[in-house]
UniProtKB/Swiss-Prot annotation:
Pfam families with a match to the protein in the record: PTB (PF08416), SH2 (PF00017)
Complexes and interactors: Interacts (via SH2 domain) with Rho GTPase-activating protein DLC1 (via C-terminus); the interaction is independent of DLC1 tyrosine phosphorylation. Interacts with integrin ITGB1; the interaction displaces tensin TNS3 from the ITGB1 cytoplasmic tail and promotes ITGB1 stability. Interacts (via SH2 domain) with E3 ubiquitin-protein ligase CBL (phosphorylated on 'Tyr-780'); the interaction is enhanced in the presence of EGF and reduces interaction of CBL with EGFR.
Record key words, sorted: Actin-binding, Cell junction, Cytoplasm, Cytoskeleton, Phosphoprotein, SH2 domain, Signal
Phosphoserine modification, residue list: 230
Organism placement in taxonomy: Eukaryota, Metazoa, Chordata, Craniata, Vertebrata
This protein's name: Tensin-4
Keyword Signal: yes
Subcellular location: Cell junction, Focal adhesion; Cytoplasm, Cytoskeleton
Residue stretches of biased makeup (Polar residues): 192-203, 326-344, 372-397
Cross-referenced Gene3D superfamilies: Pleckstrin-homology domain (PH domain)/Phosphotyrosine-binding domain (PTB), SH2 domain
Single Gene Ontology BP annotation: protein localization
Length: 696
């Protein structure tokens, strides 16, 4: 039959024959009858047929076909219809049945093959057996190539080539109102989703079929496997008819590449748990055959559905269609559903395993496992979640700064700290304003692993780490002035654009913050002598309060303070002291033609005096002023400000004896460098120390 008839998708109605509208020339062959019924898009009619000379036996076969059609028509009619039909002319009111039409098409095209259907009823089975028996008895076929059907006439023609045979498939039971789907067996790439089938419908009074699909683009109900022997076995040509409409859908199940079926199955095996994959043992069939997609159809529950109607597509593989949870499935299976669509199809991140997003698999869901047949191939494509978990847990220099949370199965034996715990306890281990001596005093009575981090007084922007180590680890030479019995080690944590890094340890990675540094070293020691123990309370313990004046003086002397300031200049004030000396020194400095260039220094106050450390080593390295040489320390009485980076900064200074001229005093001027570290703290401490010295 012509491709235009099969691919057009026209609805041809079987109506009683009418008078011929156009007559053809009589056939020259005496073997053919004068009148032969044919069909057009308008109606059935009996027209003189123009055909080439047939082989011997052709007229007998045509007569037998007409007799068989008449017998089949009489069988399908009821008793009342047979009585009424006997009084009418057979040629004027022929009501062809579905089986008679199939037999007529078979007589016209011997290569036409009827597809087996177990749900067509006993009449269809008997008709199929009769037609197959007649086909065996008639080995010789008519030399008719195809039929050209137009709106006005129909004739037999000799075509240049033989067309493919159409396949008649009653889908899922008896067709509604005698309708018949004729699916053209042509390549899928050359077909259109809207022009794939021709439906012949008659006016027989047959009951509607509840399983007849309304459209090929809708979701197709699940079918049993072909090997199960079920009456709903999928015909060979039906799968091709199902695949073509999917190519025009919004989201295509299979891409156009030859290996798309393989990659899609691998994506499903990666995301689905092992319990779901075990119910589909045949998913690892031969993927090299052309029918690899159709061979992977598996048997599902009768109450489940293969696809969702809203998707407007019918997945050809149940595993591929299980990307979304479905309401008709059981609850455990619905919980185990995961996105199985590969990123190459959906261009999204749906196929990324959950372990890559949350850091660990979902609780109450086993990690995805691969089938033995796909193990080697999948390993080359993507790493399994179990391997990812092992890679995350193993220490490496390429690990992220923030360690991932522990497994939801339960906490580890050593209770590895988390980032939240480290940040919540930072008030105990981060003391930016304390000095080196204070850090030693805090850790003196603590256990090995206790630590404290402070701002470095020698390197701007860096941090000092004081760590209490074990006795076996205290083999390194001690620095000058350091007591070996204290077992306190000091390390410098450098800060740069890459992050924070332990100075002198090339094997140490860079961390994004101090919290990440502490959290990682509390899990692994790395370059440190021992692991860090995160404190959960104040280090050194709280000392009991006392009203004793001696104890008050001692505690006051032990207190020290420090901050970063801008060193402006040093001005000789002769014999002046107090606030007047600071006021005069500031006035002299601001009246200069060229203002001094400030430098950042660390201003530290202890019971021994004031120690200045040039952070940038521009003006001096370190200066120390004993407490006995100090005279005064305070702010500018006139509240003048120093313009620092377009922001005003308060000016203060202290007065001390000159180291070169014992009779003169020198005022050293400073400006606040950071609002977080105000100068009021060091000024108050110096004033308190001077008052205590005068009392003594």
């Amino acid at each position: 039959m012509s491709s235009s008839l099969l691919a057009g998708g026209h609805m041809v109605s079987l109506t009683p024959c009418e008078e011929s509208r156009m007559a053809l020339h009589p056939t020259p062959s005496p073997g053919l009858p004068a009148l032969c019924p044919y069909y057009t898009t308008e109606s059935w009619g009996t027209q003189p047929l123009m055909a080439p000379t047939l082989r011997k036996g052709s007229s007998d076969r045509l007569q037998q076909a007409q007799q068989a059609e008449a017998r089949a028509h009489c069988l399908l009619q009821g008793p009342g219809e047979q009585a009424s039909g006997a009084s009418q002319d057979l040629e004027s009111c022929i009501d062809f049945s579905l089986e008679a039409l199939n037999q007529m098409i078979l007589e016209i095209d011997p290569t036409f093959q009827l597809l087996p259907s177990g749900t067509a009823g006993p009449q269809a089975e008997s008709t199929n057996s009769i037609m197959s028996r007649n086909k065996k008895e008639e080995p010789e076929a008519l030399d008719i190539k195809y039929i050209e059907v137009t709106s006005t006439r129909s004739r037999y023609l000799d075509g240049p080539q033989r067309c493919s045979s159409p396949c008649a498939t009653p889908p899922f039971g008896s067709p509604r109102s005698g309708s018949l789907f004729l699916s053209r067996d042509i390549p899928r790439e050359t077909r259109s989703s809207s022009n794939e089938s021709l439906i012949f419908s008659g006016n027989q009074g047959r009951g509607p079929s509840p399983l007849t699909p309304s459209s090929l683009s809708n979701a197709i109900p699940c079918r049993e496997s072909r090997t199960s022997g079920s009456p709903l076995a999928t015909p060979p040509g039906w799968e091709k008819g199902l695949r073509a409409p999917q190519r025009g859908s919004r989201v295509s199940i299979l891409s156009a590449s030859p290996v798309s079926d393989v990659s899609y199955v691998f994506g499903s095996n990666q995301s689905l748990p092992h319990s779901s994959l075990s119910s589909y043992p045949s998913s690892s069939r031969s993927l090299g055959s052309p029918a690899s997609s159709s061979s992977s159809l598996h048997s599902l529950d009768r109450g489940s559905q293969c696809g969702r109607p809203s998707d407007a597509q019918a997945p050809s593989n149940p595993i591929l269609g299980m990307g979304q949870p479905q309401a008709v499935q059981s609850t455990p299976v619905a919980k185990e559903q995961a996105s199985s669509c590969p990123a190459s199809v959906t261009n999204s991140m749906a196929d990324i395993p959950i372990v890559l997003i949350n850091g660990s698999p979902e609780p109450q869901s086993p990690p995805a496992q691969r089938t033995p047949g796909h193990q080697d191939s999948v390993q080359s494509r993507v790493t399994s979640p179990s391997h990812l978990c092992q890679a995350i847990k193993s220490p490496s220099k390429t690990l992220p700064d923030v360690p991932l949370p522990a497994s939801p199965d339960g906490p580890a034996k050593d209770m590895q700290p988390t980032m939240k715990f480290v940040m919540d306890t930072s008030k105990y281990w981060f003391k930016p304003s304390i000095t080196r001596e204070q850090a030693i005093n805090l850790l003196r009575t603590e256990k090995p692993g206790a630590f404290v981090i402070r701002d470095s007084s020698s390197y701007r922007g860096s941090f000092g780490l004081a760590l209490k180590v074990q006795e076996t680890s205290a083999s390194a030479p001690n620095r000058p002035g350091e007591d070996s019995s204290d077992l306190i080690r000091h390390f410098l944590i450098e800060s740069s654009a890459k992050g924070v890094h332990l100075k002198g340890a090339d094997e140490e990675p860079y961390f994004g913050s101090l919290s990440s540094f502490v959290c990682q070293h509390s899990i692994m020691a790395l370059a440190l002598p021992c692991k860090l123990t995160i404190p959960q309370k104040e280090l050194g313990g709280a000392e009991p309060a006392s009203d004793s004046p001696t104890h008050g003086q001692t505690s006051c002397l032990k207190i020290s303070a420090g901050c970063h300031t801008l060193y402006l200049s040093s001005v000789s004030v002769e014999t002046l002291s107090g606030a007047l000396a600071v006021q005069k020194a500031i006035s002299v400095t601001l009246e200069r033609d060229v203002l001094p260039t400030p430098t950042v220094v660390h201003f530290k106050v202890t019971e021994q005096g004031i120690t200045l450390t040039d952070v940038q080593r521009k003006v001096f390295f370190r200066r120390h002023y004993p407490l006995s040489a100090l005279r005064f320390c305070g702010m500018d009485p006139e509240q003048r400000k120093w313009q620092k980076y377009c922001k005003p900064s308060r000016i203060f200074g202290f007065v001390a004896k000159s180291q070169t001229e014992p009779q003169e005093n020198v005022c050293h001027l400073f400006a606040e460098y950071d609002a977080v570290q105000p100068a009021s703290q060091v000024i108050s401490l110096v004033t308190a120390l001077l008052q205590d010295t005068e009392r003594m």
